[in-house]
Amino acid sequence: MNIEQFTAGLEKKGISLSSFQLEQFETYYEWLVEWNEKMNLTSITEKKEVYLKHFYDSIAASFYVDFKKMNTLCDVGAGAGFPSLPIKICFPHLHVTIVDSLNKRIHFLNQLSDALKLENTAFYHDRAETFGRSKDHRESYDVVTARAVARLSVLSELCLPLVKKDGLFVALKAASADEEIETGKKAIKTLGGKIETVHSFQLPIEESERNIIVIKKQSQTPKKFPRKPGTPNKSPIEG
């Protein structure tokens, strides 16, 4: 996906990028490739691939979730900033918080945020299980995102505690998510959520399947969740 295709593809979805925003994406790409030589951020480094599989893929969440109505977003396990930072570039009013367990990545994100001239971004080096118990962050966010970092049953325990009541948890998944959704239903219900919609679409050009799962927070998460670090992954809430 070249820059013209990227711009036109977003335009079709009602997202018009300014020259400044296009510069931000260009800087993002340059920093990603440069820092990737020092640390493992991504296996995808070819420009057309980055624009398609990282930038466009991240922004695709906004085709189904109205981020214009959101104010606060938390991204769990964002790695090199996906999906939250491409979303932030497109919707600059958002206050974005990223939590990641690797301090090197947090250092990269802090530097990147400055280079992109982003405002209202915060980066935390922490485990999601610990972060979700913090009074400052628990049930504080309009929307929480996660992109393919774990199974849905595990992700729900890491993410739903951070979502405020009536807010959304948005999980971005690659191939068919049917099995994950089925095994994740118990965890979602236990943690106060309910699946609102599942959007399946084809990523342009390469036509690979993507799924965006939108979960609404209906009630408070019980105080015992999330459990201690590592437990959600070892013993997911599955029925």
Swiss-Prot record:
Keywords: Cytoplasm, Methyltransferase, rRNA processing, S-adenosyl-L-methionine, Transferase. InterPro entries: rRNA_ssu_MeTfrase_G, SAM-dependent_MTases_sf. Its EC number is 2.1.1.-. HAMAP family: 16SrRNA_methyltr_G. Residues 216-239 are annotated as: Disordered. Its main location: cytoplasm. GO terms for molecular function: rRNA (guanine-N7-)-methyltransferase activity. One of its GO terms (cellular component) is cytosol. This is Ribosomal RNA small subunit methyltransferase G. The gene is rsmG. Pfam families: GidB (PF02527). Specifically methylates the N7 position of guanine in position 535 of 16S rRNA. Belongs to the methyltransferase superfamily. RNA methyltransferase RsmG family. S-adenosyl-L-methionine binds at G77, F82, A128, E129, R147. It is found in: Cytoplasm.
